Regions:
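Compositionally biased linear targeting/interaction segments
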Residues: 9-10, 14-17, 29-331
Length: 331
């Protein structure tokens, strides 16, 4: 009996062990399967959340872009109002006038204290400035009004500017000829890079001193830098140009005739041949620049405004030639 029971027990153990191992394997497989399912679900959920976040960010960016454009329009309208008011009060343009004061970085809410505006708009910051476009050399002066032939006085003026900047003055003639050969007008300074004579380094060197306007223009001697004055007034030395800038700050010139008077007063008129067609004390083109910080982005805007002494076809005294807004920073 004892041997029989031992035999039965031994057989039972040998029979149960394989069953227990099979159950463990099944439980292990179930655990692995569950982990895989959880992992896949987590990946899918993360993907959905990421796509949702992308969609939300895209909508926010689109909203900010539209709001920034509206704020830019408001800033441009304000700039036009300032320019019209300036023309009513003064027949000359100089850096001591209200238009030349930069708009300090401030919140939109500060400008709309008595207006109920949404919190996200009230927190937006804005800064801007008006720049006299005729304080720079206008590259459009390199050609005649029809843009078919080279304008020699404009080429000579640009050559003097390049020389004042330490660049090859022959680049002026190369520019005038090169653009005509391309038979494609340039609308921004980056267009100069299509010419083999220009490099990004040269472009950055001339950028503060040149612009491109839709028509031939004069240089405003009340706002131009010393380098641009050296270009617009043949024979003007660098030291005389610097002294000219200091003198006009105290007493802005009221007419082109006063240019010669000031040069004589400074003792700097010798060797100077003044071309009245190149200079003036008034301007008609202005660059309005603004920076709008909204949400995660910084929107940089610029616009070219033309002001006329007589009403334009629209009936207004100012008009926007072009405007653009770009998002340059995102957190």
């Amino acid at each position: 009996m004892l041997n029989g029971r031992c035999t039965v027990t031994s057989l039972t153990m040998h029979t149960l062990l394989p069953i227990s191992n099979a159950a463990n394997r099944e439980r292990g497989s179930a655990t692995v399967t569950a982990l895989i399912v959880v992992g896949v679900a987590a990946v899918l959920l993360a993907g959905l959340m990421w796509r949702q976040q992308i969609q939300i960010r895209t909508l926010e960016n689109a909203r900010d872009q539209v709001q920034a454009q509206w704020l830019q329009r408001a800033a441009i309208d304000f700039a036009r109002l300032v320019l019209v008011e300036d023309q009513r009060n003064s027949q000359i343009d100089h850096l001591g006038e209200a238009w030349a004061l930069p708009l300090a970085d401030g919140k939109v809410a500060d400008f709309l204290k008595n207006t109920d505006v949404p919190d996200e708009i009230a927190a937006v910051t804005l800064q801007g400035q008006l720049i006299d476009a005729q304080s720079q050399f206008n590259l459009a002066n390199l050609w005649d009004k029809s843009f078919k032939t080279i304008n020699p006085p404009g080429v000579q003026e640009y050559g003097r500017l390049l020389d004042a900047l330490g660049l090859d003055k022959n680049l002026a003639q190369q520019t005038a000829q090169g653009v005509l050969q391309l038979d494609m007008p340039i609308y921004d300074l980056e267009g100069l890079l299509k010419l083999p004579s220009y490099s990004p380094a040269i472009l950055e060197q001339i950028r503060p001193f040149v612009t491109i306007l839709p028509v031939l223009t004069t240089v405003n001697v009340n706002t131009a830098s010393a380098e641009v004055l050296m270009a617009a007034i043949p024979g003007l030395s660098r030291s005389a140009a610097g002294a000219f800038v200091q003198q006009r700050a105290a007493t802005p010139l009221k007419s082109a005739d006063e240019i010669t008077t000031l040069l004589n007063k400074m003792g700097a008129s010798q060797g100077i041949t003044l071309d009245a067609s190149l200079v003036d004390v008034r301007s008609q083109f202005w660059l309005a620049r603004s920076e709008i910080r909204m949400g995660r982005g910084l929107f940089v805007s610029s616009a070219l405004i033309q002001r006329s002494q007589n009403p334009l076809p629209s009936g207004n005294f100012t008009q926007v030639i072009w405007s653009k807004t770009g998002k340059v920073l995102a957190d």
